Amino acid sequence: MDISVVIPVYGCKAALPELHRRLTESLSQITDKYEIILVDDNCPQNSWEEIVKICQKDEKVKGFHLSRNFGQIRAITAGLDKSKGDWIVVMDCDLQDRPEAIVELYQKAQEGYDVVFARR
């Protein structure tokens, strides 16, 4: 597995289809060996429903549902524990981070860096 994208999900059910679309478009430019890990932090919006729909349509998406709201850091940690990628991207679910930036970050990583990060 080349890339794992770990996304804690809370309060962004409506953004998930667009997030998935943009991620798959971006990641497919880099490799076909990727996974998207969506960790539902027991969101009251019932984001889990949307995660299940996306998982059923795309085998590269893995969904995990936490039994209660543990918070963003623990949701990220749960996703990291399940990730298999050589490179791991952590991003928010509300599209405040551009999925398209992953392409640029990955290209920079291929120059021999151990860690690559972006800021706005």
For the regions a language model picked out, list residue spans one by one.
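Structured catalytic core of nucleotide-sugar glycosyltransferases
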Residues: M1-R120
